[in-house]
Design a protein with these regions (language model features):
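Alpha-helix termini
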Residues: 34-36, 185, 206
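Short cysteine/histidine-rich metal-coordination sites, predominantly Zn2+-binding motifs
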Residues: 209-219
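ATP-dependent adenylation/nucleotidyltransferase module used to activate substrates
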Residues: 1-172
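Perimembrane helix-loop junctions in membrane proteins
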Residues: 107, 204-207
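Short amphipathic alpha-helical interaction/hinge segments
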Residues: 146, 206-209
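Local cysteine-cluster metal-coordination motifs and their immediate loop/turn environment
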Residues: 96, 177-203
Length: 219
């Protein structure tokens, strides 16, 4: 979604889709849709492999434990369930890598890149490394660690999932080519339908008033 927004709304011409493989259970599906996104936007695709992050992680994303079935009435307080899926300092690690890549590209090709990340408004139950404050702090840090001032931008950070879906509709995004599932299914285009992320995806479409085209293994 963010890549489409950057290309088609912000009118950036040259994009690199940077995909991170850190041993997450949905790596196959995420890679598939990231490559599809890169192809659709005529962007480069680059994969960064970070095996050590899996060793550090306490997240269910890096395990084979079955995801808990989340019901609609449980969405009022998802803090405990969210914590189970949180990968400690993941976004800091990802952005550090992205900064190193952007700095290297400038040194090599004299091409200056901005870094865009797909944070959204998480409300009260936010991850500590997915906030406006975090973006502000890491932008302050990059002024010290890079020579050319590579700005990090989260263009949709003040939008909730419902608003983002509406923006996606205006951008004519094929939502069947987006992926949210934490649990993963046997085929790339199927979401489990019961994990926290799938439930939030369903709610986003419901409140946006836009038909959800997603194929769920469990309704």
């Amino acid at each position: 979604m963010t890549a489409h927004y950057v290309k088609n709304r912000l009118k950036y011409k040259k994009l690199i889709i940077l995909f991170f493989n850190y041993g997450q259970r949905t790596v196959k599906q995420e890679r598939y849709f990231s490559k599809k996104c890169a192809k659709n936007l005529n962007a480069e695709f680059e994969e960064a492999i970070l095996p050590e992050l899996k060793k550090l992680s306490t997240s269910l994303l890096n395990s084979n434990v079955k995801a808990k079935t989340i019901k609609r009435n449980q969405l009022k307080n998802t803090s405990k369930e969210s914590l189970k899926w949180y990968v400690p300092c993941r976004n800091l690690i990802f952005l550090s890598y992205a900064l190193a890549l952007a700095e290297s590209l400038y040194i090599k090709n004299k091409e200056k890149y901005g870094i865009f990340i797909g944070f959204k408004n998480e409300g009260k139950e936010f991850y500590p490394d997915a906030t406006s404050k975090f973006i502000e702090q890491i932008n302050n840090l990059q002024k010290t660690v890079t020579n050319k001032g590579i700005k990090i931008i989260a263009p949709l950070i003040n939008k909730d999932k419902e608003e983002i879906i509406k923006i996606g509709k205006k951008l004519d995004i094929n939502f069947n080519e987006t992926y949210s599932c934490y649990s993963g299914a046997k085929t790339n285009n199927i979401h489990c339908g019961y994990c926290l992320s799938c439930r939030l995806r369903k709610e986003g479409f419901y409140w946006s008033g836009i038909k959800d085209p997603t194929i769920y293994a469990k309704k």
